[in-house]
Curated annotation (Swiss-Prot):
Cellular component, GO annotation: host cell mitochondrion
Name the record gives this protein: Non-structural protein 2
Written domain comment of the UniProt record: The DNLP motif has IFN suppressive functions like binding to host MAP1B.
Entry's localization field: Host mitochondrion
Source organism: Bovine respiratory syncytial virus (strain A51908) (BRS)
Amino acid sequence: MSTPNPETTAQRLIVNDIRPLSIETEIISLTKDIITHTFIYLINHECIVRKLDERQATFTFLVNYEMKLLHKVGSTKYNKYTEYNRKYGTLPMPIFINHDGFLECIGIKPTRHTPIIYKYDLNP
């Protein structure tokens, strides 16, 4: 009886672990393409002008994000992306600070497993 080759086992584990990671890497990449200073400015402008609460501001952010995503990648890739998001709950989420009644978006967490993209990290 032969023992399993440790290299093969490690490779199998790596392949299994990489699949969702590669999709998350794609999510970060797409989010960085979509989230710009202009995008953040528009969200913050909406928050101030319409005096949105956090739930409304998050909804506004996601609607704008999805519209830009659909425009950027086309419907086929968009459908795969949103299907993955629904399954794993990995929609990008805005991070707000409350300044005495008005919200400011200071960053985005692309998924629950990925790092935050801060407003000041974006190219103007």
